């Protein structure tokens, strides 16, 4: 009883976390948003079940269906049944398909396993469920899952799938099996390749009217033998002998959630002959098949993989101005988890790119991780009924603006501070964007080097800067004075690579000011266009003023 209470509390806590993010909509807007998404999902259902085609990725469908259910619960609507069954399925299953309850995490699985024994883990193969009925050693009937009680007659189709044994013997001669028809793959690595819309592809093949050779691209994974041998080992052996070899290969005994987690992670990264979306843990001891009912299986649960891509709600659109003056667009998101990483922001790119994506707050976007774990947008999967886009800032900035602070220069000015403090420039450890904002807000810098004049007392009394950190910052600022001349020139934004600047052998500000365009053009990786940019940069009034100021501070290389 205590275990079930713990599971219930875990589920309620999880549901509470979902309900806590209910949209702040009026009743009228909630009705409109729910109705629009409900109609779209119904259309996808009709396409899937009636025509065997899918205009949406399986993962996107699943997540938008979950989002619809969340909205319905938020605003008191009746949640819809996910994945509506085919309307004309009329063949009774000899044994009902129960479905499988999903565990929210490893802790919930551990609680479920605690009072159970003789447990086994199998891959949750991603395809379409089927019943196989054998009578007198021959395949007598194949039935689609449907609503769990009735389904479509798939006998003709399944008889053309070479991976499905058409004759069996021994205990299987008169048996009912349940399993998954899947798309056969060679070396499928779930972590790298994702779901590839396998479920919809299988459904499409099974729904086609023609009996094409493409059915031989399908396989079957048997996951249940109702009223079969009591021992799992005996079941697996008999199935393998009959030709259902995958079941024996991919069924393992487990004692606890840690063992399940290890197998789950192994299959997530291994080459498999099918697409999976998690694992199923089942007890070898099952009730008699006459007691099986849809939604009432207490002897098995699923622990799904975190999707490679997540549907995330756009909460806000923000604009940032980089040190070179380019405006970039960032989408703030309702938090989602991707590969154990909490993602709350994703870079969209330029204003033009944002306009091409047509993204507004309230939209649902598909987000995944690119190289080095950087979030990226894969698609806009749903746009809200009411869409209001913010106005981007005027494109008045360039590589020669905002060395000096002003109200319109706030973002580019901060970007310049972040750049000069980075490791590759002045190497000011312990301060990032938030720290620079705090310093500038309190002390109102005149220009990008004004921080050199801050005293230990000023740093110590800066809101947002811990007192224990202020002494470290003052030390870092003093050390920066001893940085080489080329580092200071880089901090000033000279349009050259470090390699080109080092090759120039410039060691003083006066020497740099007198260098000609021809001199810069001969440096490695510096063409005529870049050389002209250097000339424009060094002749800029703000740059000259900064050079004079650094000279007054006796920074190496700037002295007269």
From Swiss-Prot:
Q: Which gene encodes it?
A: ligB
Alphabetically list the UniProt keywords. DNA damage, DNA repair, DNA replication, Ligase, NAD
This chain's function reads: Catalyzes the formation of phosphodiester linkages between 5'-phosphoryl and 3'-hydroxyl groups in double-stranded DNA using NAD as a coenzyme and as the energy source for the reaction.
Q: Where is the active site?
A: 124 (n6-amp-lysine intermediate)
One GO molecular function term of this record is: DNA ligase (NAD+) activity
Q: Which reaction does it catalyse?
A: NAD(+) + (deoxyribonucleotide)n-3'-hydroxyl + 5'-phospho-(deoxyribonucleotide)m = (deoxyribonucleotide)n+m + AMP + beta-nicotinamide D-nucleotide
Gene3D superfamilies xref list: DNA ligase/mRNA capping enzyme (3.30.470.30), Helix hairpin bin (1.10.287.610), Nucleic acid-binding proteins (2.40.50.140)
Q: What is the name of the protein in this document? A: DNA ligase B
Name the family the entry cites. Answer: Belongs to the NAD-dependent DNA ligase family. LigB subfamily.
Biological-process GO terms, alphabetical? DNA repair; DNA replication
> What is the enzyme's main class?
ligase
Provide the E.C. number(s) assigned to this enzyme.
6.5.1.2
């Amino acid at each position: 009883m205590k275990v079930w209470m713990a599971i219930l509390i875990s589920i309620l806590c999880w549901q509470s976390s979902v309900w806590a993010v209910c949209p702040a909509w009026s009743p009228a807007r909630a009705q409109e948003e729910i109705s629009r998404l409900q109609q779209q999902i119904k259309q996808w259902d009709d396409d899937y079940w009636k025509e065997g085609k899918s205009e949406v990725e399986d993962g996107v469908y699943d997540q938008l269906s979950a989002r619809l259910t969340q909205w319905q619960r938020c605003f008191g609507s009746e949640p819809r049944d996910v994945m509506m069954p085919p309307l004309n399925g009329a063949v009774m299953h000899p044994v009902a398909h129960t479905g499988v309850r999903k565990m929210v995490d490893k802790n919930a699985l551990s609680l479920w396993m605690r009072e159970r024994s003789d447990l086994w883990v199998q891959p949750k193969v991603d395809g379409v469920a089927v019943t196989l009925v054998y009578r007198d050693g021959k395949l007598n009937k194949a039935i689609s899952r449907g609503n769990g009680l009735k389904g479509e007659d798939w006998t003709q189709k399944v008889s053309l799938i070479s991976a499905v044994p058409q004759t069996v013997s021994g205990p299987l001669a008169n048996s009912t099996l349940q399993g998954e028809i899947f798309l056969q793959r060679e070396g499928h690595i779930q972590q790298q390749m994702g779901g590839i819309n396998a479920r919809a592809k299988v459904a499409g093949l099974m729904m086609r009217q023609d009996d094409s050779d493409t059915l031989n691209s399908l396989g079957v994974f048997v996951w249940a033998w109702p009223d079969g041998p009591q021992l799992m080992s005996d079941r697996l052996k008999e199935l393998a002998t009959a030709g259902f070899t995958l079941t024996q290969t991919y069924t393992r005994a487990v004692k606890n959630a840690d063992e399940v987690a290890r197998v789950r992670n192994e299959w997530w990264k291994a080459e498999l002959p099918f697409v999976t979306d998690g694992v199923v843990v089942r007890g070898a001891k099952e009730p008699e098949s006459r007691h099986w009912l849809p939604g009432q299986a207490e002897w098995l649960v699923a622990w799904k993989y975190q999707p490679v891509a997540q549907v995330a709600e756009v909460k806000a659109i923000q604009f940032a101005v980089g040190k070179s003056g380019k405006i970039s667009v960032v989408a703030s998101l309702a938090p989602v988890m991707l590969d154990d990483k909490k993602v709350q922001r994703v870079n969209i790119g330029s204003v033009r790119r944002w306009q091409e994506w047509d993204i507004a707050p309230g939209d649902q976007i598909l987000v995944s991780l690119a190289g080095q774990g950087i979030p990226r947008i894969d698609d806009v999967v749903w746009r809200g009924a009411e869409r209001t886009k913010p106005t981007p800032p005027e494109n008045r900035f360039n590589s020669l603006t905002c060395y000096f602070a002003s109200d319109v220069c706030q973002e580019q000015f901060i970007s310049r501070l972040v750049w000069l403090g980075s490791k590759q420039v002045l190497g000011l450890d312990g301060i990032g964007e938030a720290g620079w904002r705090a310093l500038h807000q309190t002390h109102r810098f005149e220009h990008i080097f004004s921080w050199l004049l801050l005293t230990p007392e000023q740093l110590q009394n800066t809101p947002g800067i811990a007192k224990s950190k202020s002494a470290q910052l003052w030390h870092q600022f003093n050390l920066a004075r001893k940085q080489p001349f080329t580092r200071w020139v880089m901090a000033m934004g000279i349009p050259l690579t470090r390699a080109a600047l080092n090759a120039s052998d410039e060691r003083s500000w006066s020497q740099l000011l007198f260098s000609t365009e021809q001199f810069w053009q001969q440096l490695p990786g510096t063409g005529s266009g870049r050389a002209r940019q250097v000339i424009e940069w060094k002749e800029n009034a703000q740059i000259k003023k900064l050079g004079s100021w650094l000279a007054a501070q006796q920074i190496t290389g700037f002295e007269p």
